[in-house]
Design a protein with these regions (language model features):
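N-terminal amphipathic, basic-rich helices that act as targeting or association modules
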Residues: 24, 40, 160-161, 168
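Repeat-blade elements of multi-bladed beta-propeller folds
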Residues: 14-34, 61-91, 124-150, 157, ...
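Solvent-exposed loop/turn segments at secondary-structure junctions
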Residues: 35-36, 56-57, 90-91, 113, ...
């Protein structure tokens, strides 16, 4: 075992993999605990490209990525073949499936900030580990919110976004009733301390 400092501060043991790769054409796509995304030739096993997230590791107690999702945008859309990947600093990135570069026009600089309208919390309280679902023209995202640490934890809201632009479309906030609501605007915050999907 590594010393406590290496375990808790340097994250030297964060090398386990929980990702299930997806197979699109002749390529496997997967992600690493440090939110790197890789495209691998399905025949030779050689790496085609790697996107390396630059988010700082410090302050995050649980580093894991469980997978990525694939989406084909309408013809004529920039970056038409997309890989959506969660990051441990609560972002959802859209990458060009052919090059690994961030998709322009999606969110801000190719990413959406999932901490929007969630209120203030330690970074480790809200992270994204699971791939989103792309269904009926919606990018649907749930998150892992740490449990049993505080009474005022981030919301367990499930949100849907436009998979081309990254614009929010609807939100299912357990504290607002059984039906989806319009995305929040301004300084409003989704109901804190609600159940989450551990995604």
């Amino acid at each position: 075992d590594l010393p406590d400092y290496a375990e808790k501060v340097e994250h030297k043991r964060e090398y386990h993999s929980e990702a299930t790769p997806i197979h699109i054409g002749d390529t496997l796509y997967t992600c690493t605990p440090h939110s790197w995304v890789e495209a691998i030739d399905a025949t030779t096993g050689k790496t085609k490209w790697v996107w390396k997230d630059q988010a700082p590791l410090k302050g995050n107690s649980y580093l894991v990525c469980r997978g990525v999702s694939y989406f084909e945008a309408p013809a004529g859309t920039p970056c038409p073949r997309r890989i959506f990947a969660p990051t441990f600093d609560a972002r959802m990135v859209a990458l060009d499936a052919d090059t690994g570069k961030l998709c322009p026009g999606f969110g801000t600089g190719g990413a959406i900030n999932l901490r929007d309208h969630m209120g203030a919390s330690p970074r480790a309280y809200q992270i994204s580990t699971s791939p989103p679902i792309v269904a009926n023209g919606r990018l649907i995202v749930g998150e892992r919110v740490i449990d049993n640490e505080a009474h005022d934890e981030p919301s367990g809201v499930v949100r849907a976004y436009d998979p081309v632009t990254g614009a929010p479309i609807w939100a299912w906030d357990p504290g607002s009733g059984p039906d989806a609501i319009a995305p929040l605007t301004g300084d409003r915050i989704y109901t804190r301390g609600t159940p989450n999907v551990w995604g």
